[in-house]
């Protein structure tokens, strides 16, 4: 997995902004780690120096650090890709990518909304039709911030393993409208207008990165100091 120095520079610059946000929330020793985060990078390379791989770095490992979160997302995406390849080859399964969302909420409602999301998802997978098609899943919570409205949108990205026959067997296939109806039912929110569901195509890394990236985008939580963290 080659290292993207351009992306690293962008994330390191965001780390400078992050330091101002996090300072009042952590101790002096942890703050030193955040300030020095990824100032030392050691690489291994091939003979031509065209391919380089990060070997060692001084990471702060703070879950909100833009650099550390980006590196973890890349690592998780690779892990997901390897897992999917194994399950496809050994277990003969396919995958669908499901995104579940609800209307935005204000900051003081966010904690309760996340709890409600988790409860609703548990109800969803216990539904007979859903439970019969899911052979395994990976779920990630992502929270985005709308600067204009000053509100938040928590939503789930779910990678679901299904039998190959799922897409052709009408007894088990769940259409987008059915997913929407099920999600509306378990949340009790009829105002939900859409869910997104699609089959994962081979070698498509976009969905994997959506799954792997951190639950809050640094572009969102570094906007408003009074609302963040």
Curated annotation (Swiss-Prot):
Protein origin, superkingdom: Bacteria
Protein's UniProt keywords contain Transmembrane helix: no
UniProtKB keywords: DNA replication, Plasmid
Binding site for DNA: 214
Family: Belongs to the Gram-positive plasmids replication protein type 1 family.
Keyword Cell membrane annotated: no
Lineage: Bacteria, Bacillati, Bacillota, Bacilli, Bacillales
Name of the protein this chain belongs to: Protein rep
Originating species: Staphylococcus aureus
GO biological process: DNA replication
């Amino acid at each position: 997995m080659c290292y993207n120095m351009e992306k690293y520079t962008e994330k390191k610059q965001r780390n400078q902004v992050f330091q101002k946000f996090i300072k009042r929330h952590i101790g002096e020793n942890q703050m030193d780690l955040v300030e020095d985060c990824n100032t030392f990078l050691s690489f291994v390379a091939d003979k031509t120096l065209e391919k380089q791989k990060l070997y060692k770095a001084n990471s702060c490992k703070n879950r909100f650090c833009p650099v550390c979160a980006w590196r973890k997302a890349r690592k998780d995406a690779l892990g997901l890709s390897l897992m999917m390849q194994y399950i496809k080859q050994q277990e003969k399964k396919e995958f669908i990518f499901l995104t579940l969302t609800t209307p935005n909420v204000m900051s003081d409602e966010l904690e309760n909304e996340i709890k409600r999301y988790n409860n609703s998802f548990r109800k969803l997978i216990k539904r007979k039709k859903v439970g019969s098609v899911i052979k395994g899943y990976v779920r990630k919570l992502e929270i985005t911030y709308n600067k204009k409205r000053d509100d938040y949108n928590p939503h789930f990205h779910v990678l679901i393993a299904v039998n190959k026959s799922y897409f052709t067997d009408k007894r088990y296939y769940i259409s987008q409208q059915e997913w929407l109806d099920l999600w509306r039912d378990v949340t009790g929110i009829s105002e939900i207008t859409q869910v997104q569901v699609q089959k994962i195509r081979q070698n498509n890394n976009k969905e994997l990165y959506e799954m792997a990236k951190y639950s809050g985008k640094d572009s969102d939580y570094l906007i408003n100091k009074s609302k963040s963290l």
